[in-house]
Amino acid sequence: MDNLDKYGEHNDDLDSMYSTYDRNNYGDYDNSYKRFDVNKKEVCLSYSSMQSYYECAFKYYLDNILRPDDSDVTFFNTIGTIAHNVLQEMVLDNTKDFDVLWDNQVTFTSAKESYFNKKIKEEIREDFNIILNQKELSYFDDVECEKRIKLKLRDNIFFKGFIDKILKCKDNLCIVDYKTGNTKIEDKYFEFGLNLQLPSYLYLLQEDPSKIIGFYLQHLVAPKYVYDEKKDIETQKNEDMKLSGFTSNDISRINILEDLDGKSSVVSKLAITKNGDLSKNSKVIADEDMKDMIKLVEDKILEASTSILNNDFSINPKVIDNKNVSCIYCRYKDICYKRLKDYVYYETKKEEAVDGD
């Protein structure tokens, strides 16, 4: 069969084989997922697992059902965890010794890891000083760190997550999630169940939107700087540490973050005009839109969970506005043997993106 398939050579034994096995589709391969009962009686999604499902249901199946052994913990995973832990401790009590907190968690042995550890440690120290300066501009009187939440939507459907930091002033709240990567929160993808990290925090808190000041990401490790003769490194660092996300359009709430006068020193894409109005380029959101966001998150949780309980793990990577948003960084892209017919195509009209992780 191999000689026939590769070189077109006909062997006399083929006729007797065909009479026994008939002419099958030798060399053909069906990559499609064959639905079967994976015995999943309940689903507990997080933002990341829901993101995985909406990127590609088969990816979720591999990550969360089969769970191939992948015990490798990268340097940047570890350094990210250390940064989160140290910032949590320092935000709660800034009299603690930064060096002791950091060094007690470090287990790096190679010269390369030790070098980058020192560099990142100093950058996180700078980050903390900027966070303190931002706090001095605000009227927050309380903070809660690493808040873990698990919600029950149905008897067999749950949603969980944790929020790095919740800043409080009386009944008003501000949500902050630290990031050490380079993510962009693209709200044009929300309707497809993607990039719902910030809206997920709103959903987890289950608070009235009228209490929300804003919900944001905050970069901890700076990207590569593009030279700008008008800005020194310190200025660029302060700009990179601005909160990125969505701010209430209620100026009275915004003024809890800082006494806003012109361009915000704390939040990116936020400014007030000389007339006292929010600038047209400000990234703000109304309470009703927050309610819609919360409703969308719940709908997407239920939609994904129902499909998972129905054993739907099709290979269905998404292409949005001609951009493949599922396969670029997928570690399974070489084993799913996806075909053109497997892609799911969407188009959006929005062009807005919010810088994040």
Labelled PLM ranges:
Residues 1-357:
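RecB-family 4Fe-4S metal-dependent nuclease core
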